């Protein structure tokens, strides 16, 4: 259960989570692939979510991802990001890591209302390279 008290978080707390979904256009934005690989290099289970993607390599939505996701890494425009936040609320996904350019005041407010912990930062900066 997500509670309103969980509405803020720091990146180091989220980076300890083991199961991630990276939401972005994996075919058009090379940073999305870099984020996925960086998380995997740290032993994370990472699901690729791309509304324009092609299964089975990518899931169309968070609802299609098997199992429980602990953290979503958001790498889409803020308008699409609002849809992702709504899916997170419906699925009970408690953590949102927002990459530069993907955030908005609306996303922050909606996360707070849903009790989703939100951190704005960059996985590539906050998670060192070359772990495994």
Which residue ranges define each predicted feature?
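Mobile, glycine- and charge-enriched loop segments
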Residues: 45-46, 52-54, 58-77, 118
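A short helix->loop->beta-strand "cap" motif at the edges of active sites that frequently abuts
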Residues: 44, 91-96, 114-116
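Short, charged/polar "capping" segments at the starts of alpha-helices
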Residues: 29-31, 54-58, 102-107
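Rossmann-fold NAD(P)-binding glycine/threonine-rich loop
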Residues: 100-127
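Hydrophobic, well-ordered beta-alpha structural blocks that scaffold small-molecule cofactor pockets
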Residues: 1-52
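A short acidic, amphipathic alpha-helical/loop segment
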Residues: 34-35, 83-88, 107-110
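Mid-chain, well-packed structural core segment of small domains
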Residues: 62-102
